[in-house]
C-alpha cells in the first residue's frame, strides 16, 4: 500500500508526513483551490449564473424517516443508507424532469418501497410472514391485520422472553417535487409523514394468538393519487418482571404491502 502524503491531526496538533518540497507543492495547490476562482468552473446557465444542484433523494429520505419515526428503534445503522439507494433509483427513473430537478415519484415505484429492510440481522420476521393476513379499505385510511392461531416456534424466541406482542403500522409518503418558488424539494401532499401504530395484547410465548389488529389514520384523512401507504408489521418480545413488561432487543419489523 502506497504512502499518501498529506496533513493529519494528532491530538490537538497537526502533523505532516510530507517532505518540504511535497509540502510546498501541496500548499500551492491548496491556495489555488481556495482563492483562485478559475481553478474550478461550475456549470453556468444562459445568463452566466452558476447552476445550482439540488438533491431530491436526500429530502425524500428525510420524509421516509419521518414515516418510520416510531420504528427507528428497531432499525440497524445502515437503514438510512438503504433508503437513500431506493430514493436515488426512483429519482433517476424520472425521465420527464429537468436535470438536477427531477421528481421522486414514490407513487409510481411502489415496488421499490416494498423492498425496505429495517434490520438485516433480524430475519425471523421473514420466516413468520406466511402467518400474517392483511386487508385494507378502499380509501386506504384503515387496515386490519388478521392473526389466526398465530404461534411462534421456540427456536425463534430469544432467551429470557416471556411474552410477545404484534405491532401494526401504517404510514403515508407523498411524491417529492422541486418547488421553483421555494427553491427546494417539497412533498406534493401535506399528509406525507403521517403514521399510526397499534399493538396487540401481550401474549405468553408458546400460546397461539387469534386477533384482528386494526390500525387507521385520524378520521377525515383523505389520500390523493400522489400518496402511497406503507403497511408494516412486527413482532416484539418482552420479559415480564415485577408486573412490568421489559422489551428485549431483536424486534423484527417488515413491510408487507404498499398501496
Language-model segments: residues:
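Long, polar/Ser/Thr-enriched low-complexity segments
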Residues: 1-122
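Charged linear interaction tracts used for macromolecular binding and regulation
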Residues: 91-239
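Short acidic/polar inter-strand loop motif in beta-rich domains
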Residues: 237-249
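Proprotein-processing/basic-patch segments
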Residues: 250-259
Amino acid at each position: 500500500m502506497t504512502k499518501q502524503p498529506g496533513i493529519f491531526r494528532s491530538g490537538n496538533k497537526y502533523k505532516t508526513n510530507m517532505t518540504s518540497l511535497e509540502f510546498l507543492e501541496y500548499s500551492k495547490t491548496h491556495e489555488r483551490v481556495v482563492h483562485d476562482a478559475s481553478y474550478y468552473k461550475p456549470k453556468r446557465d444562459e445568463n452566466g449564473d452558476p447552476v445550482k444542484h439540488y438533491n431530491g433523494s436526500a429530502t425524500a429520505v428525510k420524509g421516509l424517516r419521518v414515516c418510520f419515526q416510531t420504528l427507528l428503534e428497531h432499525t440497524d445503522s445502515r437503514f438510512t443508507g438503504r433508503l437513500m439507494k431506493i430514493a436515488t433509483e426512483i429519482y433517476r427513473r424520472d425521465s420527464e424532469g429537468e436535470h438536477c430537478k427531477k421528481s421522486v415519484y414514490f407513487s409510481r415505484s411502489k415496488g421499490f418501497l416494498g423492498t425496505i429492510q429495517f434490520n438485516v440481522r433480524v430475519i425471523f420476521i421473514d420466516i413468520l410472514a406466511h402467518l400474517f393476513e392483511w386487508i385494507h379499505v378502499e380509501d386506504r385510511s384503515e387496515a386490519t391485520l388478521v392473526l389466526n392461531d398465530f404461534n411462534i416456534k421456540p427456536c425463534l424466541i430469544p432467551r429470557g422472553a416471556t411474552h410477545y406482542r404484534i405491532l401494526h403500522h401504517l404510514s403515508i409518503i407523498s411524491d417529492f417535487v422541486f418547488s421553483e418558488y421555494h427553491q427546494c424539494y417539497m412533498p406534493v401532499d401535506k399528509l406525507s409523514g403521517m403514521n399510526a401504530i397499534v399493538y396487540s395484547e401481550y401474549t405468553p410465548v408458546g400460546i397461539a394468538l387469534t386477533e384482528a389488529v386494526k390500525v387507521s389514520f385520524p378520521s377525515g384523512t383523505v389520500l390523493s393519487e400522489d400518496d402511497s401507504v406503507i403497511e408494516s408489521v412486527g413482532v416484539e418480545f418482552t420479559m415480564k418482571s415485577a408486573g412490568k413488561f421489559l422489551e428485549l432487543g431483536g424486534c423484527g419489523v417488515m413491510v408487507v404491502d404498499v398501496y
